């Protein structure tokens, strides 16, 4: 084999990336470093400045590293190939290839050992953990500030205690002959490390762990134990962290390049190496001269510092700078960051055969074509042209061919045409946010210098023609061309991988043209369907004209007999289910007949599909239907024709934009005046002390935002009015069709601009009443500048943040690949329609489409099985399930998939971009990451302060029925107040609307204290009010009548009277009682007594006591009589600035990073009754006591938080005790994986839904699966795990199976949720983690543990230069594994023959 390798070297085929299965990283011993080295470097010189030859024994020495020219020694005695392998006796250089200078290493023998800075300073310090010292003490020893006692002997000193210079001298005087051993510097630490016996220490520490009780000590021991175990298992020795010699990397990797003018450009590493060599040589000389100790020690310290700088400059002390005052780039910096080796050269490479140019629109191209400028094509396809020129005998040599191409001879162009035929090229537009950012096209040669792009693919590329540039790449090999054609051709990417909807949809002008064609004019609606005659048979009303064929319609159109929008009766030819032609008579317009003409004939595509006004959404539905029923080819042809039709008629229609198209509604003045009056009224209420300042502000902002909406509605009504004889408003057509503009933009042009936000995000309560058509006043203009500027600044930030989110997502999900068809999992997720405020936001059929059924679906009415387990739900099945009235379906999900690596096909379901079951080898993780990250730039950056600027809707203060139905009230606990209105007393009351069949259609939460306006079982109509409440305060309501008594409400300690400066009215407010005298355990509350002075008992058996949290406003006096349903106190919900709702991108990032939100909810972990325990310092104690088991769970809650439960309330698992956003970790711990996935999917979908972005749930599930890769050990059983250790889930399951098979106790663990950054850094693969973030830390950790990287993910494989194990690469991997096995067998059989050749 060795011979074979040498032969390969001569042929220039060195080391293939395919010949290994895993990569291991570990510490190198001095012997290993010596074995790599080809010689010791003794001098700091680089090259001779006169001869430019490398100095002997210097950093570029040819004797050590190899010759400078191929097969030529330095002195020139031996030249040419025939002397290969000879070592020149004069200059000592081996005659071989010059490229060995890229692979041969040297070394420097150090005069004194030095510590490796990575293992010293990377936290936690590995050397520190091994010797059990703090980093501070270690540094004192290593940098020669303090001595350390290694062996106390018989002296009273402790082992490893530090001594200063003076103490050291005293100790040596006193105990010099007691066998004491004291050391300093790296030598001392090395001695300590040498004495460590990992195996024995491991046992000792395990024992100590069992015996220890203190938590802090346990944590420390666990850390140490893990490290010592890693050393024991990996055959590394701890003393290797201290180096006796350092390797020198090959000279070609740190080149010295002569510039013109006799100067040299050099890599920073050479400077760093030179410092090390200089100091090392000086130290050697000082030791030989027997210099005083202090000088030697100083030199040793400097040597340590220079080695530190070489490995990681700037990690300790000031960074060493070069001549131009910038820090030198050390070995660590070469790997780190965006410019480091990993991200710059290994993950992203520049490629040849590529070019870029500006793009222009190419409306006459077919969908699979792009226009490529001739000049570019000539350059890109040069080698192909040369070979063809030779083949056809136009040129005899490559040189001649080259000349012909340079002169651009006519035959060259003919050959170019031939070369390009059916050779796809790839177009890419940066930023490539999802896989549709690179697509393949067939080039069409064009004149000019700009690339032509098909208009329909612009959506996928997110391209427009305002100067965008695109890059072209040529796939060279046949396999690459095949992949480009089969997988990446634009015609194969009709559906979006994010949501399975068509992405090749017409937009802008095309939509406008189609909308205009299919317009319903008032004349159309006024024309009757047929002619009407009177009794004498005279024509009284002219109806729609009739036509027999589409041809006749076209003829009449061109003759001017009918107009595009007249009503006609025509015949439409289509086919039935058997494929036989049928004709149907339709009432329609000539315009729609033109669209029908290009429609594919198919029974599932009826004329009614286009016999309506075609808005952008309708057009998308048509394309979707054509794709689903007629297949891809028909769909592509249809899209191209549709584009042509749309463009042609948009041009003919001549729809334009005039200022008079913007109509200011007449009602505007009335609406504004009415709102101004309301605002005045609120001001008055505030002056009279009926409402607080915060409430007034809230009400004012609400009133204005309602007014703006009403003005907008009036304007839209005005603009969309159609009258006979009048042309339809152009601007309305543009907006309504979805071509351009939105009601929100039109509102600013012709309605009123509305509310604006201040820099802090608060809303300015004075709105801009004017619009752009009327013109803004100076003050209006000034108010609006801020918002406009913030918008621009936000956009810039947003792009960066969104890109970073995508990067983290890709990193965490990159190794999630479909590995098998079925994992056989029995588990799944229960899915139901998503409701929001009673509206169905996403129906059940939408959510289960393209998923696999996990358990048989039964018809709720008959109980028969609709669909069996493992059925893939297609459109038809989803509709059937929805029609049957099924409420929830158990579907398989990647979260419950039991595949060991990757996921299985059935758990994933349909491949959204193809509409078929997913293939093995599909990289679903990366697709998920791209689908979530790509719309990131469309999300907002703002943190909404209760519903951000000007977008805020009015506070919700009532529930209206969204449809007709019957009312059911869940958890109905009510009292009737003095007006006999029922008041809701339960914390989780819900109103459910059901239809006639009893199927739930809407569900509304009704808050505590709301007034119920309907009874159980009542029939309600749409928009009927069901309940209402005050949105600005949380009330505390009594359920009994009685006399109020204040408890612990002591003036100026817990209760103050606050006077409002503006109104002069006072209110009683409960304050935080920190000033109270110690020992007085005050808990402000109200209690109710009956006529006899006894405390009233409530229905649940508790006393009627109501606890008051700080900031409550009391509504009753001490001793007052109250009746049931009265409000005792109210807690204001602070307006504008209350809890900030984190919205948009930051919210998505917060969820994926699994951060604990500010002011989060505290949820109950058990069922039980609430009791208030004894307070603890600044916290309140809530106890939840389970009645059956008698278990008690304590919760400590900061005093300022509002507790949402009262004493004696019954809470269930997962109910909030304190309101606020929920913490995902708590949900996982208390309610399990399914609830967590439900929560995360819904929260993330809410953010995207707000922007109208559709993403399939399964993408979010894939990411959540990756966040749940680890488990935390609760009970180690007989395994070697430690309590509290986080272990990989798969590793944990393997270990447990092993223990069970051996008849031992398995470990127990619970799943932990990790944020995406943390999960990426803790993947199995250290290469992937190192190329993500914190490179040095990851590599340090991997090296001490002697980690192996088995190259399972995509990223590791890209880095080592193999095909990725996904897509076509997964097949290749399998084949390669089989082939390698066969090769081994053959080699084994042929071995004796090889040895003879030796």
From Swiss-Prot:
CDD domains in UniProt: RNAP_beta'_C, RNAP_beta'_N
Binding positions for Mg(2+) per the UniProt entry: 464, 466, 468
InterPro entries, alphabetized: DNA-dir_RpoC_beta_prime (IPR045867), DNA-dir_RpoC_beta_prime_bact (IPR012754), RNA_pol_asu (IPR000722), RNA_pol_N (IPR006592), RNA_pol_Rpb1_1 (IPR007080), RNA_pol_Rpb1_3 (IPR007066), RNA_pol_Rpb1_3_sf (IPR042102), RNA_pol_Rpb1_4 (IPR007083)
Annotated Zn(2+) 2 binding sites: 823, 897, 904, 907
Binding site for Zn(2+) 1: 73, 75, 88, 91
Keyword terms, alphabetized: DNA-directed RNA polymerase, Magnesium, Metal-binding, Nucleotidyltransferase, Transcription, Transferase, Zinc
Cofactors that this protein relies on: Mg(2+); Zn(2+)
Cofactor, how bound (note): Binds 1 Mg(2+) ion per subunit. Binds 2 Zn(2+) ions per subunit.
Keyword Magnesium: yes
Stated name of the protein: DNA-directed RNA polymerase subunit beta'
Organism: Gluconacetobacter diazotrophicus (strain ATCC 49037 / DSM 5601 / CCUG 37298 / CIP 103539 / LMG 7603 / PAl5)
Lineage start: Bacteria, Pseudomonadati, Pseudomonadota, Alphaproteobacteria, Acetobacterales
């Amino acid at each position: 084999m060795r011979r074979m390798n040498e032969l390969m070297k001569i042929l220039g085929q060195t080391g293939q990336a395919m010949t290994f299965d895993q990569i291991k990283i570990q510490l190198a011993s001095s012997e290993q470093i010596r074995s790599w080295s080809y010689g010791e470097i003794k001098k700091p010189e680089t090259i001779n400045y006169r001869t430019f030859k490398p100095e002997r024994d210097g950093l570029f020495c040819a004797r050590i590293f190899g010759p400078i020219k191929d097969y030529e020694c330095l002195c020139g005695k031996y030249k040419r190939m025939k002397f290969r392998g000879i070592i020149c006796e004069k200059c000592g250089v081996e005659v071989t290839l010059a490229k060995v200078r890229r692979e041969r290493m040297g070394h420097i023998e150090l005069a004194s050992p030095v510590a490796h800075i990575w293992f010293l300073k990377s936290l936690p310090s590995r050397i520190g953990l091994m010797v059990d010292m703090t980093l501070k003490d270690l540094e004192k020893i290593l940098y020669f500030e303090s001595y350390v006692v290694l062996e106390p002997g018989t002296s009273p000193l402790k082992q490893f205690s530090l001594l200063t210079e003076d103490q050291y001298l005293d100790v040596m005087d006193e105990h010099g002959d007691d066998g004491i051993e004291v050391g300093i510097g790296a030598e001392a630490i090395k001695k300590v490390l040498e004495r460590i016996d990992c195996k024995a220490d491991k046992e000792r520490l395990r024992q100590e762990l069992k015996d220890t009780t203190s938590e802090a000590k346990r944590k420390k021991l666990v850390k140490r134990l893990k490290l010592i175990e890693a050393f024991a298992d990996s055959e590394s020795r701890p003393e290797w962290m201290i180096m006796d010699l350092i390797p020198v990397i090959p000279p070609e990797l740190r080149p010295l390049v002569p510039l013109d003018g006799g100067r040299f450009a050099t890599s920073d590493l050479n400077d760093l190496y030179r410092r090390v060599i200089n100091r090392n040589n000086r130290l050697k000389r000082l030791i030989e001269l027997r210099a005083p100790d202090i000088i030697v020690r100083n030199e040793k310290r400097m040597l340590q510092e220079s080695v530190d700088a070489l490995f990681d400059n700037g990690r300790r002390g000031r960074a060493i700078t070069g001549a131009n005052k910038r820090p030198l780039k050390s070995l660590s910096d070469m790997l780190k960051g965006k410019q480091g080796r990993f991200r710059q050269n290994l993950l992203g490479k520049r490629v040849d055969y590529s070019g870029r140019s500006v793009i222009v629109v190419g409306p006459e191209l077919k969908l699979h074509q792009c226009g490529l400028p001739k000049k570019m094509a000539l350059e890109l396809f040069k080698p192909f042209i040369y070979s063809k020129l030779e083949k056809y005998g136009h040129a005899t040599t490559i040189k001649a061919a080259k000349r012909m191409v340079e002169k651009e001879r006519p035959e060259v162009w003919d050959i170019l045409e031939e070369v390009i035929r059916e050779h796809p090229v790839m177009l890419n537009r940066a930023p490539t946010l999802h896989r549709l950012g690179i697509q393949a096209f067939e080039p069409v040669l064009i004149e000019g210098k700009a690339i032509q792009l098909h208009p329909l693919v612009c959506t996928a590329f997110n391209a427009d023609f305002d100067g965008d540039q695109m890059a072209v790449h040529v796939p060279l090999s046949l396999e690459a061309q095949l992949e480009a054609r089969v997988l990446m051709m634009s015609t194969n990417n009709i559906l979006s991988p994010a949501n399975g909807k068509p992405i090749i949809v017409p937009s802008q002008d095309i939509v406008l043209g189609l909308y205009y064609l299919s317009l319903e004019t008032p004349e159309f609606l006024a024309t009757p369907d047929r002619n009407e005659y009177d009794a004498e048979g005279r024509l009284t009303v002219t109806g729609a004209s009739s036509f027999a064929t589409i041809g006749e319609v076209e003829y009449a159109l061109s003759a001017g007999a009918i107009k595009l929008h007249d009503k006609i009766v025509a015949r439409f030819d289509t086919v039935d289910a058997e494929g036989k032609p049928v004709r149907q008579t339709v009432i329609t317009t000539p315009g729609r007949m033109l669209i029908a003409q290009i429609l594919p004939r198919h029974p599932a595509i009826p004329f009614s599909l286009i016999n309506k006004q075609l808005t952008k959404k309708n057009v998308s539905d048509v394309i979707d239907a054509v794709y689903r029923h007629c297949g891809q080819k028909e769909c592509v042809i249809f899209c191209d024709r549709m584009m042509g039709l749309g463009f042609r008629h948009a041009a003919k229609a001549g729809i334009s934009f005039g200022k008079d198209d913007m109509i200011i509604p007449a009602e505007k003045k009335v609406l504004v005046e009415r709102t101004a009056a309301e605002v005045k009224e609120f001001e008055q209420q505030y002056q009279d002390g009926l409402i607080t300042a915060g409430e007034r502000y809230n009400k004012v902002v609400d009133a204005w935002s309602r007014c703006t909406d009403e003005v907008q509605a009036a304007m839209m009504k005005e603009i969309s009015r159609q009258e006979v004889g009048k042309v339809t408003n152009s601007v309305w057509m543009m907006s309504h069709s979805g071509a351009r503009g939105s009601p929100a933009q039109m509102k600013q042009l012709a309605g009123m601009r509305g509310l604006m936000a201040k820099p802090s995000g608060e809303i300015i309560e004075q709105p801009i009443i004017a619009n752009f058509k009327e013109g803004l006043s100076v003050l209006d203009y000034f108010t609006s500048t801020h918002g406009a500027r913030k918008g621009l600044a936000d956009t810039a930030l947003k792009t960066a943040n969104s890109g970073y989110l995508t990067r983290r997502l890709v990193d965490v999900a990159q190794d999630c690949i479909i590995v098998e068809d079925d994992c056989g999992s029995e588990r799944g997720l229960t899915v139901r329609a998503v409701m929001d405020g009673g509206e169905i936001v996403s129906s059940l059929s939408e959510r289960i489409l393209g998923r696999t059924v996990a358990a048989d679906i039964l018809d709720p009415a008959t109980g028969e099985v609709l669909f069996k387990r493992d059925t893939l739900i297609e459109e038809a099945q989803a509709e059937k399930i929805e029609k049957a009235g099924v409420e929830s379906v158990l579907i398989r999900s990647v979260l419950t998939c039991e595949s060991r690596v990757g996921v299985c096909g059935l758990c994933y379901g349909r491949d959204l971009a193809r509409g078929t079951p997913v293939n093995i080898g599909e990289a679903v993780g990366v697709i998920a990451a791209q689908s979530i990250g790509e719309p990131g730039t469309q999300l907002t950056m703002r943190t909404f302060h209760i519903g951000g600027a000007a977008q805020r809707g009015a506070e919700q203060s009532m529930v209206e029925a969204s449809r007709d139905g019957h009312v059911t009230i869940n958890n109905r606990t009510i009292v009737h107040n003095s007006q006999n209105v029922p008041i809701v007393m339960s914390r989780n009351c819900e109103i459910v609307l059901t239809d006639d069949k009893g199927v739930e259609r809407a569900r509304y939460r009704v808050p505590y204290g709301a007034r119920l306006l309907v009874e159980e079982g009542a029939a309600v109509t749409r928009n009927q009010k069901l309940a209402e409440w005050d949105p600005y305060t949380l009330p505390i309501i009594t359920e009994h009548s009685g006399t109020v008594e204040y408890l612990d409400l002591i003036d100026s300690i817990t209760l103050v009277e606050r006077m409002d400066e503006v109104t002069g009215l006072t209110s009683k407010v409960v304050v935080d009682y920190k000033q109270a005298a110690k020992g007085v355990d005050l808990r402000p509350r109200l209690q109710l007594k009956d006529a006899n002075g006894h405390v009233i008992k409530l229905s649940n058996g508790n006393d009627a006591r109501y606890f008051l949290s700080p900031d409550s406003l009391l509504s009753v006096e001490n001793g007052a009589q109250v009746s049931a349903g009265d409000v005792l106190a109210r807690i204001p919900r602070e307006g504008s600035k209350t809890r900030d709702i984190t919205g948009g991108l930051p919210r998505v990032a917060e969820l994926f990073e699994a951060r604990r939100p500010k002011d989060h909810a505290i949820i109950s972990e058990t069922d039980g009754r609430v009791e208030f325990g004894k307070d603890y310092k600044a916290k309140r104690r809530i106890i939840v006591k389970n009645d059956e088991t008698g278990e008690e769970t304590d919760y400590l809650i900061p005093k300022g938080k509002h507790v949402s439960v009262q004493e004696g309330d019954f809470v269930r698992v997962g109910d909030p005790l304190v309101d606020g956003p929920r913490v995902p970790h708590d949900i996982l711990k208390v309610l399990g994986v399914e609830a967590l996935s439900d929560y995360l999917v819904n929260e993330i979908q809410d953010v995207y839904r707000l922007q109208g972005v559709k993403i399939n749930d399964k993408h979010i599930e894939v990411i959540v699966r990756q966040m749940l890769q680890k488990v935390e050990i609760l009970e180690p059983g007989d395994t070697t795990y430690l309590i509290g250790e986080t272990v990989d889930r798969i590793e944990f399951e393997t270990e447990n199976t092993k223990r069970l098979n051996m008849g031992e106790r398995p470990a127990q663990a619970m799943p932990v949720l990790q944020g995406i950054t943390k999960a990426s850094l803790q993947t199995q693969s250290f290469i992937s983690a190192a190329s993500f973030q914190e490179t040095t830390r990851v590599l340090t950790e991997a090296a001490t543990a002697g980690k192996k990287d088995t190259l399972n993910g995509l990223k590791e494989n890209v880095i080592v230069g193999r095909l990725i194990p996904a897509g076509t690469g997964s097949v290749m991997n399998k084949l390669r594994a089989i082939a390698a096995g066969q090769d081994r067998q053959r080699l084994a059989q042929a071995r004796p023959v090889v040895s003879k050749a030796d």
